[in-house]
Amino acid sequence: MKIYMAPLEGVTGYVFRNAFEEYYGKGRIDKYFIPFISPNKSKGYTTREQADIAPEHNAGINVVPQIMANDEGLFLEAAAMLKELGYSEINLNLGCPSGTVVSKYRGAGFLAKPRELDIFLDKVLSSPQMKDMRMSVKTRTGMESHEEFKLLMAIYGDYPLSEIIIHPRVRTDYYKNSPDMDIFRWAVGESGVPISYNGDIFKIKDYEKLVEEFPDIDSVMIGRGFVGNQRLINQIADLSIDNTDNGQNHDKVDFTHDDTLDKHDMETLEKFTGRLLKDYIGIMDSEVNAMHKMKEVWIYINQFNPGHEKAFKKIKKSRNLTDYQNGVREFFDGRKI
């Protein structure tokens, strides 16, 4: 099963992707999806967007740019620009639940207009500008009800999409409630296009359960799980080795204590977060802004490392780089075995 990293706006930019690849990915992430660029008629692309899609910032890893648009002309302009940069695959964002996005009928909001979405896909995928370009969609299963997904899947099935990445939540769920595996199971049975699963794969037991229940899906996309529980990719790789040789040439993988970081895990995490801070300082206009960027990452790390509230509180409340580093030092010094 192929492994993808999900695009998390403001988190999995090129600095994060490159650091993650060095310390964790190591060629085992089949695709890194770039957080969406949003083409518009007047403003052009932001500095962040331009930096994120720059080929020199993505050397050595397989990245797929994501576009958020509901205007076929703007989408095709963005696709042409990405093609010139050397990209051969793009992804359409039909999943972002943000209110400001949805109010403009983009992201998950586009799902509320299935007729317009159908016309959009027809014009985009029949355009000569899409020659030699693959296009996938990352979609939720509706705006308010999973029943909406039956029509949406019928629409997707009419077009030569390279894959459909399904997050089985509706827009009104945001990230609450549980993914609806019944609607996902239905979609897997209906689709003639490769299907990828996205949603709440946080620990190895979540991945194992998915693979056991859906052994024939093409890939799984993981976002928050990789940001906060980076060694999950190592556990997935170990599990794959064990399954490949039926355990005959490999010690049985034991994930009984998968919540516990050992000394090697801690050393790797320390190097990873250290590189992130260094690289953010190198591209941002102040150390304080780089520190705030790191705090976003630590919010996710905190979710997978309970029992260390004192260190996390110091990190969260730090007002300068020295305070931040003291909090980080307390976390690592208190965890190393």
Give the role of each language-model region.
Residues 3-6, 32-34, 63-67, 90, ...:
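Hydrophobic faces of well-ordered beta-strands that scaffold small-molecule active sites
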Residues 3-4, 9, 130-131, 149-163, ...:
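Alpha/beta catalytic cores of nucleotide-metabolism and tRNA/nucleoside-modifying enzymes
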Residues 8-10, 37-39, 68-70, 95-97, ...:
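Active-site beta-loop-alpha junctions enriched in small/polar residues
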Residues 8-81:
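Glycine-rich, positively charged N-terminal anion/phosphate-binding segment
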Residues 21-25, 81-84, 211-213, 237:
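Short, solvent-exposed amphipathic alpha-helical segments in soluble enzyme
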Residues 24-27, 79-90, 94-99, 104, ...:
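Alpha/beta enzyme core
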Residues 49, 105-111:
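Short glycine-enriched, charge-decorated loop/helix-capping segments at active-site entrances
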Residues 110-114, 177, 262-266:
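Flexible, glycine- and charge-enriched loops at secondary-structure boundaries
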